[in-house]
Each structure stands twice: as C-alpha cells, then as structure tokens.
Curated annotation (Swiss-Prot):
This is Queuine tRNA-ribosyltransferase accessory subunit 2. The gene is qtrt2. It comes from the Eukaryota. Non-catalytic subunit of the queuine tRNA-ribosyltransferase (TGT) that catalyzes the base-exchange of a guanine (G) residue with queuine (Q) at position 34 (anticodon wobble position) in tRNAs with GU(N) anticodons (tRNA-Asp, -Asn, -His and -Tyr), resulting in the hypermodified nucleoside queuosine (7-(((4,5-cis-dihydroxy-2-cyclopenten-1-yl)amino)methyl)-7-deazaguanosine). Transmembrane segments: none annotated. Heterodimer of a catalytic subunit qtrt1 and an accessory subunit qtrt2.
Length: 415
C-alpha cells in the first residue's frame, strides 16, 4: 500500500492510496471515506441496489464485533468474508468495534479486549484476534487495542495503562502476523490511544510509528464537537508526529462540520456510519456542499435551506416522535414530520440518486408512517450518495484551493 500526496493545504492532505487489494490494483482518493456495513452488508441494501449509488468507496468497512460470533461458520467456508458476503472483488478494512454501537467500559484486561456482538461479550486475546483475521482475510485491519479511554473522564493511571496495553497488543500481533504466511498481504493499522493527555497521545503516536504498520487509527475521538478546540488540538499534535506517507483513519466522526475540522488537522479516511444513523432516524441529508455553485441553481439551493426546510423549525410536528430525534443535526430533514405529507418534491432538488429521481418526500413520509422496509432502502440510497458526493466536493475544493470556503459554507448551515 502506497500513499502519494499531491497537495497539502491548511493541514488537509490531497492524494491517492494505491497498490492495495489482493492484486495490488486498487486505488482510493483521500480525503475519503469507507463503505460502512453491518456484517459485511450495506445496511438496508442488496448488492444490486448498491450498484445504483454513485461514488461508492473502493474500500468496504467491516467490524470484528459483528462478525466474531460467526467465526465457526466462516472457518468451515474457508474462502474469507469477501466471497461469503457475495463481494469477492471488494477490498475490506476490518475495525475492532462498530462505530455506531457504544461499548460498555471496564471489561478490558492486560490479556484481552472485550468485543460486544448481538450475543453479548466476546473476550478477544491477540491469539484469537489473529485467528479471526485469518478467517476473515481482510486487506487492512485495525490492530487490537485498549480503546476504552476517550478524551475526558479518565484518570492518568488508566490512560497510561491503555497506551501500554495497546503497544503490547501491537507487538504481539506483529509477531503472530509474521508466523502466518496467508496474512502477509494484509496491512495492519496501528491504533493511537491516550485519551485527553497530550504526553500519552504523543507517546502512543511515536511508539506506534516505530512499528511496521501500514497506517494509523486515531482512536477515541468520536463524539467530539467541531467547536471543541482543546480536543481538536490533540488531533493536530498527534498527526504532526505521524509519517507523511501513511494514511490516518478515524472512527465515529461523521457530521460534515466535524469531518472538515479533522481533515484540516491531517486526517485522511473516515467511516460512513453517519448516513446510516441519519437513515435510522427517518431523515434525509439536504446540506449543500458545492463550494462553487452554478448561478442558475444558487437561488434554488438557497430556497432548500430556507427556514421552513430546516430541522429547527419551531412549528414542525413529528407524527411519531422517538428518542432518535434528539440526535438530529442541522444537515438533515426529518421526513416523519407532518409537513411532508403533501410535499411531492424530491428529497433534495438536483440530487441524481434513485430515490430523488423516482420518488417524493410525501411518498417516503408515507412509507415511514406505514413502517415499510422500503423507507430505509430509499433513504439509505439517498444518504449514502449525498455523503459520498460530499467527499468528492472536499477533494475538488482542495484541488481548487477552496477548502476554507467549503468549511465556511458548511459552518453557515450549522448556525
């Protein structure tokens, strides 16, 4: 795997990752995102419906926590997760945890990390971890690490222990990797831990960079708001310690404003769980991300973001409110609201996704109220395509030297 940077602007890195995949013929532009999946399948979508989406990332994101309990089945199959999931030509990145599902804390030890699947807790030693990777056969995988510590709320002693454990796990995994010929083509991604302690973050980054890893995961930064400068400064400090020629990953950061903050601090790759979370709320992404809008559509886009279209509309009534609505962002509209019952326009004017070309807000509202499975399918198609096009706009803005203009455009939609 090789990362070639073509431009660095305001900390943001534009480039291409090449020479990866089983045949070494795949490429991935950065900044970019991965295709989020549940047990190696895009949520709500079949392989055929996935093909209708434009700009699908070259790398599919699978999670060990959702697949570990199926290890025996995959061992008997003996062909790896790619063929098992019907995606034989896909490139897979395997993370330890699902970024959507919070993990209970207090269960990691010096010998094992606890994963949480549908059947409960699974203790994962380094031996079991490498055994699972041999069965899954991903192209990239995150190293086992003690990632319970996040910025805020942990003692210095616990944070130091997290870094120490993670480095021990990394060394053990590297040793085990060298003993298994079938894992030689796989790329190990080292995890940078350290909570909110700058010295521990830097120690973790420096020590991990000394090992033969193919990239770095900045772990434990999910849930940090875009305006939290103290925490964001940790990201800048960590990326400054990492080699320029290896990609930097992050999990659980998906809001457009947060993505741009992290990109401008040197992060390259994100997961795409955010559009899935938006879909689960019965919402559709409608934010504008064109930093150089066509004058003919500028008035239309302005209308899209008018007061009556925003989530914060005081008069908006949701027919069946639920707890998820508290998580809504200014970048989406909730199609459960009564005002969409007779709105026969597309989810987003100008969007070329299958849903917007063929169906209306009123129809999706009806599907949500009737609890039809098609609602999730149509929303997932739209939200994935809009999110993937957002990253395309980020790369275009970097090429044009307009990344700050794009960040300002996104910031205005968050105000």
């Amino acid at each position: 795997m090789k990362l070639s940077l073509s431009k660095v602007t305001s900390g943001a890195r534009l480039g291409v990752i090449s020479n990866f995949g089983r045949n070494g013929d795949k490429t991935l532009e950065v900044p970019g995102c991965l295709l989020y999946t549940k047990t190696a399948s895009p949520p709500h979508l079949t392989h055929d419906t996935l093909q209708t989406i434009e700009g699908v990332p070259a790398v599919t994101h699978i999670t060990l926590s959702t697949l570990a309990e199926h290890q025996e089945v995959l061992e008997e199959y003996k062909e790896g997760i790619g063929k098992f999931a019907g995606l034989p030509d896909a490139v897979f990145y395997c993370s330890t945890h699902d970024p959507v599902s919070p993990c209970p804390t207090g269960y990691n030890t010096n010998k094992a990390v606890s994963l949480w699947g549908s059947g409960g807790r699974i203790e994962m030693t380094t031996q079991k971890f490498i055994s699972a990777q041999r069965v899954l056969r991903p192209d990239w995988f995150q190293c086992l690490s003690d990632g319970e510590v996040t910025p805020g709320g942990n003692s210095r002693k616990r944070i130091k222990k997290s870094v120490d454990r993670s480095l021990v796990f990394l060394d053990e995994c590297l040793q085990l990797l060298s003993e298994h010929e079938e894992l030689k083509p796989c790329v190990l991604i080292g995890a940078v831990e350290g909570g909110d302690l700058l010295d521990e973050r830097l120690r973790s980054a420096r020590e991990t960079a000394k090992r033969p890893v193919g990239g770095f995961l900045l772990d434990g930064f999910h849930g940090i708001s875009a305006g939290n400068e103290a925490k964001l400064s940790l990201v800048s400090a960590v990326t400054a310690e990492l080699p320029e020629d290896k990609p930097r990953f992050i999990h659980g950061v998906g809001r457009p404003d947060e993505v741009l903050e992290f990109i401008q601090r040197g992060v390259d790759l994100f997961d795409s769980c955010f559009p899935y979370q938006v879909t689960e709320r019965g919402c559709a992404l409608i934010f504008t991300h064109c930093h150089r809008p066509d004058p003919e559509t500028a008035v239309l886009e302005k209308s899209e973001m008018s007061d009556t279209e925003r989530n914060g509309d005081v008069g908006a009534e949701i027919e069946e409110p639920d707890a998820d609505q508290a998580e809504m962002t200014p970048f989406e509209i909730c199609l459960k609201e009564k005002r969409f019952r007779e709105d026969f326009g597309p989810l987003l004017e100008g969007c070329t996704c299958y849903c917007c070309r063929n169906h209306s807000r009123a129809y999706v509202h009806h599907l949500l109220m009737a609890k039809e499975l098609l609602a999730g399918i149509l929303l997932m198609i739209h939200n994935f395509q809009h999110y993937f096009s957002f990253f395309s706009s980020i790369r275009a803005a970097l090429r044009d030297g307009e990344i700050k203009a794009l960040a300002e455009l996104i910031r205005k939609q968050n105000s």
